[in-house]
Amino acid sequence: MKQEPTTYQPEEIEKKIYEICSHRGYFEINGNEKIQEKGKRFCLMMPPPNVTGILHIGHALTLSLQDILVRYKRMDGYKTLYQPGLDHAGIATQNVVEKQLLSQGVKKEDLGREKFIQKVWEWKEKSGGAILEQMKRLGVSTAFSRTRFTMDKGLQRAVKLAFLKWYEKGLIVQDNYMVNWCTKDGALSDIEVEYEERKGALYYIRYYLENQKDYLVVATTRPETLFGDSAIMVNPNDERYKHLVGQQVILPLINRTIPIIADAHVEMGFGTGCVKVTPGHDFNDYEVGKRHHLETIKIFDEKGILNAHCGEFENLERLEARDKVVAALKENALLEKIEEHVHQVGHCYRCHNVVEPYVSKQWFVKPEIAQSSIEKIQQGLARFYPSNWINNYNAWMRELRPWCISRQLFWGHQIPVFTCENNHQFVSLDTPLSCPTCKSEKLEQDKDVLDTWFSSGLWAFSTLGWGQEKSDLFNESDLKDFYPNTTLITGFDILFFWVARMLFCSESLLGELPFKDIYLHALVRDEKGEKMSKSKGNVIDPLEMIEKYGADSLRFTLANLCATGRDIKLSTTHLENNKNFANKLFNAASYLKLKQESFKDKERLNEYQTALGRYAKSRLNLVTKEVRNALDNYRFNDATTLLYRFLWGEFCDWFIEFSKVENEAIDELGSVLKEALKLLHPFMPFISESLYHKLSNTELENAHSIMVMPYPKEIAQDEKLEHEFEVIKDCIVSLRRLKIMLETPPIVLKEASVGLREKIENTERLQNYAQKLAKLEKVSVITYKPLKSVSDVGEFCQTYADLENLDLSPLIARLKKQLEKLEKEKLKLNLHNENFVKNAPKSVLEKARESLKTLLEKEGKIQQELDLLEQP
């Protein structure tokens, strides 16, 4: 016979429970079919992690919160869809496969597009999506049979359809425009650029007038871009330069002339008051160039290599060219000075390459696409949790610029735009055979792919079958049943990358916002509040934490620390504490199991007959009401705190203790714990499942899972009985304090009395519990104060010990010894020494006086006790 473990061993049960529940289809839409209630629908989309990704602590937080909510709704009778999937992650995935090929001496350009994409698919099938398996370790109950991939056949069609619809409405256009350009990864949208503060330099360059005697000094952080200058600009009201407007200056190093122009854009008090205008390589200058009809000159190619506009510097890499340009300026006496300068430098979010403003012909989504979604958010048709995030959303949407959606990659959704030999351009959902305008069969598809966020922006409805032919991955009724989705849970860091785009993509195509509630959680940091990084050595690996503490402890900890709007400071101490919590529950169930073989499910308060059973169930019902309210309002931390306080602070610390007096209540306490485990299940699915079956004397292999049982709903309370037990608890605690105060060997307190501030119905019950749990032979309930007694004051009572028949001399001797010790400690402070007081540093004196204050307080309390004990 297998020996029962003495402590909770998560590794022995987690995999087994997960596999059984998954195999039975509990995670699927109809997994809870027997308890589904008509008209109740719940849908939550998993933010699709990158196919290259592995589970990190941020994923663990998002997935834990999502799964808690999904399990709650599933148990509460909702037809539930928790939609899983993976993102093709264009740049990231291409980089992974590219590196693998380079290690074999193969470049992607040598393979060509089709063969390279074939290699990516091979990699995806072999190594991609490891994160989905890792999610299972966390207990994530998502509908894995419906897993979608943003490059699967159906979603490719949905992407093309969205592009076609927006193209036909004029919301997608192709144009030459200033974009963020990574010389490695190509065009980036504004929010794919990360800005870092860098120490750089400000170069003051001389631009000579045509007379070659006078010059203007212009400051720049990017001297290599001077070859693209189209003008020098001054403020029209600047008296220093008014007379020069309209004249020409000579461009340093290459002797091309450019005009001096006037524009109110220039701040007269900044720098020299003169600025260079480089329309081809600066966002502001690009707009200035359009206003003044200046030439836009590109000085480097897509790889950042300087071109013929740069004279002798042609073929140098842009950043490498900087030092050589500066050296040439010095050599030709064209450099006035160099100053240290701290400024923000944009980097590619993926490869951290320095990003350049660059004019390029790209595809864009116009900002007008978002207008309707913005208006609906203002009308309150979707709510943000915490509510302050709507301010961030509004601020960003007000400044929305055209979204650059074309990317210079092989891997991704190839833009479905075709051009024939006669330059007719059209969009097609399928591969066309001929041009619809001129019937030419010589067609070429646009080589660029769409921004990864284009396809993930459709996630809320494309996964439900929108724009696709029939598939086993969705049902025909899914859009009707699950769109709009109910809730979105994700990190605030992708509010603009993903959430805002889903809002306007969904509203634009389906006429409704994609979800009703948007919960944005904070970031997980280390215990000091610092960002986790490998270089700091403070990264907490969720898989390692699951190995060490169990999935339940990690889930419960993350939910408990997820206070609304605050960053999460995670430490292994938190995980250890919640592993101990799991073990406490294990011990409570084991204790009950020793007393009785199995326990029934009792959902209603009126089924409980013993006073302790009714009290415990009444308290559970209050917690049920509060936990439901917390979950309905996304207060995950409040829900975990309520459960922890009830299960440890009440059930384990009090109800179990009370049962040692009222043994007949054991049966009903087992039923209360079973109901409480259902309440706990969404947070700690494994231990709740295991202990439920332990108390039922069943095995999951042959019984229904707790996860498809109804979530507790009963909220009826017996408030009178609850109050009576609160009074009893208060009396016991007070009596225990009294014993600690008085009991010094050989003194043993055998009798005490209790004075109540208000009457309770059953004083006999109070006396019975108090005698047993405070370990006294007799407890009397009185309405007067004994003449010679010491007392302790509680919230609902005052307890007394009669001193008449006690030999108090050992206690008096102990207290006097404590007074002597305190007197010596006071002398050590030296505050009686005038020289010390006169010469000691202020901080030392303050510390000594604070210590004296503490000692005097202790002395006063002890003296008060002595006076009481020595009274005649």
From Swiss-Prot:
A motif ('KMSKS' region) lies at residues 531-535. It comes from Helicobacter pylori (strain J99 / ATCC 700824). Belongs to the class-I aminoacyl-tRNA synthetase family. ValS type 1 subfamily. Monomer. Gene3D superfamilies: 2.170.220.10, HUPs, Isoleucyl-tRNA Synthetase, Domain 1, Valyl-tRNA synthetase, C-terminal domain, Valyl/Leucyl/Isoleucyl-tRNA synthetase, editing domain. CDD domains: Anticodon_Ia_Val, ValRS_core. It is found in: Cytoplasm. Its EC number is 6.1.1.9. The keyword tRNA processing does not apply. ATP binds at residue 534. It catalyses: tRNA(Val) + L-valine + ATP = L-valyl-tRNA(Val) + AMP + diphosphate. Its main location: cytoplasm. It is an enzyme of class 6 (ligase). The gene is valS. GO terms for molecular function: aminoacyl-tRNA deacylase activity; ATP binding; valine-tRNA ligase activity. Residues 810-871 form a coiled coil. A motif ('HIGH' region) lies at residues 49-59. Pfam families: Anticodon_1, tRNA-synt_1, Val_tRNA-synt_C. GO terms for biological process: valyl-tRNA aminoacylation. Keywords: Aminoacyl-tRNA synthetase, ATP-binding, Coiled coil, Cytoplasm, Ligase, Nucleotide-binding, Protein biosynthesis. Catalyzes the attachment of valine to tRNA(Val). As ValRS can inadvertently accommodate and process structurally similar amino acids such as threonine, to avoid such errors, it has a 'posttransfer' editing activity that hydrolyzes mischarged Thr-tRNA(Val) in a tRNA-dependent manner. Transmembrane segments: none annotated. ValRS has two distinct active sites: one for aminoacylation and one for editing. The misactivated threonine is translocated from the active site to the editing site. It comes from the Bacteria. GO terms for cellular component: cytosol. This is Valine--tRNA ligase. The keyword Cell membrane does not apply.
